[in-house]
UniProtKB/Swiss-Prot annotation:
<keyword id="KW-1053">Target membrane</keyword>
<feature type="disulfide bond">
    <location>
        <begin position="36"/>
        <end position="65"/>
    </location>
</feature>
<comment type="similarity">
    <text>Belongs to the macin family.</text>
</comment>
<keyword id="KW-0044">Antibiotic</keyword>
<dbReference type="GO" id="GO:0044218">
    <property type="term" value="C:other organism cell membrane"/>
</dbReference>
<keyword id="KW-0964">Secreted</keyword>
<feature type="signal peptide">
    <location>
        <begin position="1"/>
        <end position="24"/>
    </location>
</feature>
<feature type="disulfide bond">
    <location>
        <begin position="29"/>
        <end position="72"/>
    </location>
</feature>
<keyword id="KW-1052">Target cell membrane</keyword>
<keyword id="KW-0732">Signal</keyword>
<feature type="disulfide bond">
    <location>
        <begin position="55"/>
        <end position="83"/>
    </location>
</feature>
<feature type="disulfide bond">
    <location>
        <begin position="51"/>
        <end position="81"/>
    </location>
</feature>
<dbReference type="GO" id="GO:0045087">
    <property type="term" value="P:innate immune response"/>
</dbReference>
<protein>
    <recommendedName>
        <fullName>Hydramacin-1</fullName>
    </recommendedName>
</protein>
<keyword id="KW-0929">Antimicrobial</keyword>
<dbReference type="Pfam" id="PF14865">
    <property type="entry name" value="Macin"/>
</dbReference>
<dbReference type="GO" id="GO:0016020">
    <property type="term" value="C:membrane"/>
</dbReference>
Length: 84
């Protein structure tokens, strides 16, 4: 039940984003926040894979969360999954 509520809240938040140019901004926010932010970690394993698992799925050796400039227009910096 907790996962369902979390998914609904994240979905509402993403729908509420009004892209100024393209739908890519919503995707950028999703990719930025979906694996590495503390408030979104509840979805890891259910809604999306962990950073390390996602990177391995992409054929990389490992992945880790690092603070980087954000691609999402709603924040300047964000914890983002980086694959190695």
């Amino acid at each position: 039940m907790r996962t369902v509520v979390f998914f609904i809240l994240v979905s509402i938040f993403l729908v509420a984003l009004k892209p100024t140019g393209t739908q890519a901004q919503i995707v950028d926010c999703w990719e930025t926040w979906s694996r590495c932010t503390k408030w979104s970690q509840g979805g890891t394993g259910t809604l999306w894979k962990s950073c390390n698992d996602r990177c391995k799925e992409l054929g990389r050796k490992r992945g880790q969360c690092e603070e980087k400039p954000s691609r999402c227009p709603l924040s300047k910096k964000a914890w983002t999954c980086i694959c190695y």
